[in-house]
Amino acid sequence: MRNETIIVNGKKLKWLFVERGFKIPSFNYTTTTEKVPGRPGTIKKARDLEGYEFDVPLIVRNDYLAGRKDHDDILNEVVKFFDYDEPVKLQFSNKKWYWNAYFDGPFEIVSNNDGFITFNVQVILTDPYKYAIDGNQNTAISDAVSVVNAGTAETPIIVEARALQNSNYYMISKGDEDYFMIGDDDLDKPLKDYSPLILEDEARSFSGWNKQNTIDFTDNQTGGKVGGSFIVSDSKQSFYLNNDSVSGNGWNGAMYKRSFSKQAQDFTTTVKFGINQKNKGAVRFAQYIYDSDNRVIASIGYTNPNAKQAIGTIIVTLFDQSGNQQTIYKYKNNPSLYKLDSFVVYIRLTRKDDVFTVKSWKYKEFPYPLRKKAFDEHERQFVDGGNFYQRPVVALSLYSAKNGSNNVMPLYIFGTYTRELLPRPINARDMIIKKGDLITIDMATKNVLVNEESFLSEKTFGSNYFNVDKGHTELVINPPGIFDTTVKWQDRFL
């Protein structure tokens, strides 16, 4: 029989094995009973599935075949292997399931360590379930989707729904009682799209964009000289700066401009771009908004000015009619991001009457079990008390720049989306879900995203997150004919 290795967060040490005879704990139910005088036997008060705390006995093979190591080398490798502040995947190499586990010490490793060495690692399971390594998914047909959970316990699901048309709500239900919904389905309320798109572009081609060779305003925060060019990525999913198209000292870059489908007074605009921090370098990015006189009225930018560090800052500014620039938002990335190789940045600027609202957040798909997560969210408002920034808006431009001969941090523009905001009557229903939107509902983490933005504020009162039972479950989607829905799940075991 082959020796069984231990796999932690997808990694293993080739010389570390599980000692034979280890008994895997399962089915950790405890029943609490109470004796009632005058009645035979007892009555059940509670039955609970408890967590686990147990030791896993491990063996270090320390010989010429595995490569000899001294005590400190072994200890340091083992500490790195198990040192996590969050629960991570714990798997045994001969099994087709994993736990989400914490690890505790102490590690007691003998100083004289030739041959085979034994020690224990303490495993803490606050989540008592085992999860199948291979996931499952099924696509809805005629607004119904079947889920077959081959495990021995109910399991949470992930719902992904692509809107084929605008909609005021999305609901997925299990039977007559369990359902989850975002939006408002009250038919007595008037329904209209109060935030129609006036520009949507996902950086797939330069069609509709005009390359700019001159610039008539000064942005000292995230701007610079123009004249360079963008490249469309091979995947046709982003624009990025052609570094060979610009030269000279200081900030030099490329700018492309595009008009809205109509002029707008109140508006909201969101820009989305990716940062590759693994390659250290300096970079600037900005999206500029233009008024009806073709003057810049706002900039939405990002800068990493130090070519040897990864400390980015989001900066949003407004321009008056004379071109004077005022910063209304400045937010440095949370230090927890400094060690990430890459992530996606979203910045949204909204003008409603005399109030400007800026919201930024980051997004990433984290490793297995794969979870989509929005994080480092931050929001701030600015009141235009003097009505200096109230001109109608008609166009925007995208700008990305490098600094002289310094290394460039790769920045990929993924898309820009601008909507006009129309007056909305009290209690009216809005088309909060637009054609093409991707809804993600994670029942395990209680996380709701629409286009990678947290959407928990739109969760309908009375709806709840739910699990699917072991065996077969039928789920129903409403409204009918509007969404292309896929449900993902992992079989779960006691």
Predicted regions and their residues:
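Noncatalytic modules at the cell exterior or secretory-pathway interfaces
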Residues: Y84-D85, V159, S342-T350, V383-A401, ...
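Short tryptophan-centered beta-strand motifs in secreted/extracellular beta-sheet-rich domains
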Residues: T269-V271, Y338-L370
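Extracellular/lumenal carbohydrate-interaction signature centered on repeated Trp-anchored short motifs
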Residues: K257-T269, P335-F343, F466-V468
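Secretory/extracellular carbohydrate-interaction modules
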Residues: S207-N324
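Flexible glycan-contacting loops in extracellular carbohydrate-active proteins
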Residues: P369-Y412
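Extracellular/virion structural assembly segments
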Residues: M1-L199, N276-V283, I289-R295, Y417-L494
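Short, aromatic/His-centered strand-loop micro-motif at the edge of beta-sheets
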Residues: I315-Y346
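Extracellular carbohydrate-recognition regions
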Residues: A150-T152, E177-D234, P410, E420
